[in-house]
């Protein structure tokens, strides 16, 4: 994955995520819009095989980079929990 910040203000962020697909972007968007500090979160991908997705975040004034980092940490925690639960189930 290669990440390129296209635009950043105090409450908005536009990030290109090269090589990523709907899988990661949908997960990020879904978690971002559940955050009370986020006023808008969506992504645009013109065509999955010829363009890279661009993620847009608008916050209530909270640093959007901080919000995105915290969202990534939530995803990591959820994956860790899944590994734990799956390992226990697989060994039962």
Swiss-Prot record:
Belongs to the archaeal Rpo11/eukaryotic RPB11/RPC19 RNA polymerase subunit family. It comes from the Archaea. The keyword Transport does not apply. The keyword Nucleotidyltransferase applies. InterPro entries: RBP11-like, RBP11-like_dimer, RNA_pol_Rpb11_13-16kDa_CS, Rpo11-like. It catalyses: RNA(n) + a ribonucleoside 5'-triphosphate = RNA(n+1) + diphosphate. It is found in: Cytoplasm. One of its GO terms (molecular function) is DNA binding. Its EC number is 2.7.7.6. HAMAP family: RNApol_arch_Rpo11 (MF_00261). This is DNA-directed RNA polymerase subunit Rpo11. DNA-dependent RNA polymerase (RNAP) catalyzes the transcription of DNA into RNA using the four ribonucleoside triphosphates as substrates. Pfam families: RNA_pol_L_2. GO terms for biological process: DNA-templated transcription. Keywords: Cytoplasm, DNA-directed RNA polymerase, Nucleotidyltransferase, Transcription, Transferase. The gene is rpo11. One of its GO terms (cellular component) is DNA-directed RNA polymerase complex. PROSITE patterns: RNA_POL_L_13KD (PS01154). Part of the RNA polymerase complex.
């Amino acid at each position: 994955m290669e990440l390129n910040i296209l635009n950043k203000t105090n409450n908005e962020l536009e990030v290109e995520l090269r090589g990523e697909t709907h899988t990661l972007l949908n997960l990020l968007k879904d978690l971002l819009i559940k955050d009370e500090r986020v006023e808008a979160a969506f992504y645009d991908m013109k065509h999955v095989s010829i363009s890279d997705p661009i993620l847009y975040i608008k916050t209530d004034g909270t640093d959007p980079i901080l919000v995105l980092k915290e969202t990534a940490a939530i995803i990591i925690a959820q994956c860790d929990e899944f590994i734990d639960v799956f390992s226990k189930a697989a060994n039962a």
